[in-house]
Amino acid sequence: MINLRKTHPLLKIINQSFIDLPAPSNISAWWNFGSLLGICLIIQILTGLFLAMHYTSDTLTAFSSVAHICRDVNHGWLLRNLHANGASMFFMCLFLHVGRGIYYGSYLYKETWNIGVILLLTVMAMAFVGYVLPWGQMSFWGATVITNLLSAIPYIGTTLAEWIWGGFAVDKATLTRFFAFHFILPFIVTALALVHLLFLHETGSNNPSGINPDSDKIPFHPYYTIKDALGLMLLFLVLLLLALFSPDLLGDPDNFSPANPLNTPPHIKPEWYFLFAYAILRSIPNKLGGVLALLASILILLIIPLLHTANQRSMMFRPISQTLFWILTANLITLTWIGGQPVEQPFIIIGQLAPMLYFLLILVLMPLAGLFENYMLKPKW
């Protein structure tokens, strides 16, 4: 009798995606992050579902309901800490996943890459509306500052901002709709992730060498299921260390105070995973210019496939491009640091130079490095 997993209409899809999938024999641990992101999404949906059972999206009770979850609900503190720190793990995996894609030229699978960028934007939106829900000081003022950016859009900006708010400022209507958005977005992300996987399986996985791996494929199970399981254990280890030993390490102390529209915190800043974009936003002393730079800093990922000039796909054998890639990584870490600093010297000048270098590296230096490496590879005799 032929195996059920190969004939059953549903099991067949799972089999072709996770069991008998032909995978390159040389993919490294950098290829673990796709499965880790899937697990992060499942953790977030499950913990979020149980939190939503006890949370109330009303300005008068939202803050108290979060305190109630932590104090009175069975293991509520654990659910909340796993959900909050799970978001940090999610973004850590996301950034590493995108970095892997840039380093090894995975962006040349254009459909997969473009869906990935849409996924990144959707997850960022999801995290932003989620951060507003506890209705602490930083939740409220973060929502006020970021939604206010819409008013920079010429002509329709103010109307658009008021439409999002459901009034003339961030208030009860805003909180209620943000809860609705935060509930629906994970399911949209799940659907997009399936499309992402669908496009990936049309072409098959890339590999560190960037060379076509068709001549040397191995089944996904057991080789990569066991490899992913190791990554999963490490992810759980870091998540549990964070959630159990220092759950507030990555949070903002201001969010322990209930939202107060009459009292602005001294330093308004988002969670660590948005700080790089926030630094780029703040670097331009013009509202519309800052908003455009903020959008460009993420949407620039969409044009990376068009900027690929090298004859080789991967950076594995391209030392000049490698150097520029690691400068870009250091630059993003610098931007993250600057985004969390007050607006004063020397942070202002660093915060203006770093975004310039960011765009210069991606738009000019890396394409030029690719062309130069092509020239260096040509025989000179």
UniProtKB/Swiss-Prot annotation:
Membrane topology reported for the UniProt record: Multi-pass membrane protein
SS bond partners: none
Binding-site residues, heme b b566: H97, H196
The record's free-text note on cofactor binding: Binds 2 heme b groups non-covalently.
GO BP terms: mitochondrial electron transport, ubiquinol to cytochrome c
One GO term describing the cellular component: mitochondrial inner membrane
One Pfam family it belongs to: Cytochrome_B
UniProt keyword terms in alphabetical order: Electron transport, Heme, Iron, Membrane, Metal-binding, Mitochondrion, Mitochondrion inner membrane, Respiratory chain, Transmembrane, Transmembrane helix, Transport, Ubiquinone
Compartments it resides in: Mitochondrion inner membrane
GO molecular function: metal ion binding; ubiquinol-cytochrome-c reductase activity
Transmembrane segments: 33-53, 77-98, 113-133, 178-198, 226-246, 288-308, 320-340, 347-367
Gene3D superfamilies: Cytochrome Bc1 Complex, Chain C (1.20.810.10)
Binding site for a ubiquinone: H201
Positions bound to heme b b562: H83, H182
Cofactor or coenzyme needed: heme b
Subunit field text: The cytochrome bc1 complex contains 11 subunits: 3 respiratory subunits (MT-CYB, CYC1 and UQCRFS1), 2 core proteins (UQCRC1 and UQCRC2) and 6 low-molecular weight proteins (UQCRH/QCR6, UQCRB/QCR7, UQCRQ/QCR8, UQCR10/QCR9, UQCR11/QCR10 and a cleavage product of UQCRFS1). This cytochrome bc1 complex then forms a dimer.
Note: Heme 1 (or BL or b562) is low-potential and absorbs at about 562 nm, and heme 2 (or BH or b566) is high-potential and absorbs at about 566 nm.
Protein role: Component of the ubiquinol-cytochrome c reductase complex (complex III or cytochrome b-c1 complex) that is part of the mitochondrial respiratory chain. The b-c1 complex mediates electron transfer from ubiquinol to cytochrome c. Contributes to the generation of a proton gradient across the mitochondrial membrane that is then used for ATP synthesis.
Family: Belongs to the cytochrome b family.
Protein name: Cytochrome b
Record organism: Pseudantechinus macdonnellensis (Fat-tailed marsupial mouse)
Top-level taxonomy: Eukaryota, Metazoa, Chordata, Craniata, Vertebrata
